């Protein structure tokens, strides 16, 4: 398997892991304050990242790499978790997943602005078409067409995340995918530890098991392991191209719900999935 195809495989694994992020955050925020959840998930992942760096004796990034790492930290360690936690106080997970369909487009735009990538016009046609198909479908099935403060928070989350994805994918070509997220987490660790203590609830007695499981998932998988595969995939296959795999993330979320919660899988879901796969394949061809 060549480097380009490896990028698609790694990107797909990363997206599959991220697919559980919003449902897990929705469950976790029912038991934890958004500020504590944002800080704790980053602090837990940061401690694990620090241990990994020390055990493997990874050398420090070059001086010029710290600014890009700060952007990654701002985008995916702080911005996206914070704004999604705030948004999920005002909406259910299904409605929040609507906005995830805009993430591939946001990432591709930042790939052009920050990474200098130049996909051709057909790539943009299929990227916009794919985002439009998934957005329309998820907006329809969410059953909530009203707009409010939660929608603003989710839009901010997508902007921060797209920026962090593109910057991290670019830096991964130089220092490696898992190294990028580990160093970004370590960079933000002192601040996140402070916030974790500041927002820590007086007691955990009333915190449900499901909320704790949600916190563990977003800390270990969404904040750390998923990025090992995702940033490596972006570096190998191209940021704009691999970003289109995120179109599958909302549909994966529905598939997870169907498998674990025995929810009904409709024909419309299968049709939209097929259409999305075609858009991803076309974007891959023209990227």
List each model region and its residues:
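Glycine-/small-residue-enriched transmembrane alpha-helix faces in small-molecule transporters
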Residues: 1-39, 143-170
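Hydrophobic/aromatic residues within transmembrane alpha-helices
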Residues: 28, 37, 41, 87, ...
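Hydrophobic transmembrane alpha-helices of multi-pass small-molecule transport proteins
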Residues: 49, 70, 110, 119-140, ...
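Transmembrane alpha-helical segments that form core, pore/gating elements
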Residues: 49, 107-109, 113, 144-201, ...
């Amino acid at each position: 398997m060549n480097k380009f195809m490896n990028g698609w495989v790694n990107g797909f694994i990363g997206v599959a892991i991220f697919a559980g992020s919003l449902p897990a955050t929705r469950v976790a925020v029912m038991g934890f304050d958004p500020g504590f959840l944002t800080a704790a998930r980053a602090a837990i992942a940061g401690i694990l990242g620090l241990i990994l760096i020390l055990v493997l004796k990874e050398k420090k990034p070059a001086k010029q790499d710290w600014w890009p790492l700060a952007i990654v930290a701002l985008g995916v360690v702080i911005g996206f978790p914070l704004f999604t936690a705030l948004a999920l106080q005002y909406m259910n997970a299904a409605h929040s997943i609507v906005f995830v369909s805009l993430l591939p487009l946001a990432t591709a735009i930042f790939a052009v602005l920050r990474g200098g990538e130049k996909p051709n016009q057909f790539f943009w046609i299929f990227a916009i078409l794919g985002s439009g198909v998934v957005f329309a479908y998820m907006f329809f099935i969410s059953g909530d067409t009203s707009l409010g403060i939660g929608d603003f928070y989710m839009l901010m989350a997508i902007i921060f995340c797209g920026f962090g994805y593109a910057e991290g994918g670019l830096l991964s070509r130089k220092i490696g995918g898992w190294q990028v997220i580990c160093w970004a987490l370590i960079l933000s660790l002192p601040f996140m530890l402070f916030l974790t203590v500041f927002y820590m609830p007086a007691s955990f007695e009333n915190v449900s098991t499901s909320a704790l499981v949600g916190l563990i998932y977003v800390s270990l998988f969404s904040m750390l392991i998923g990025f090992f595969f995702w940033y490596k995939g972006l570096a190998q296959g191209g940021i704009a191209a691999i970003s289109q795999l995120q179109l599958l993330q909302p549909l994966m979320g529905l598939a997870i719900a169907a498998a674990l919660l025995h929810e009904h899988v409709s024909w419309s879901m299968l049709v939209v999935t097929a259409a999305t796969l075609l858009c991803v394949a076309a974007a891959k061809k023209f990227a």
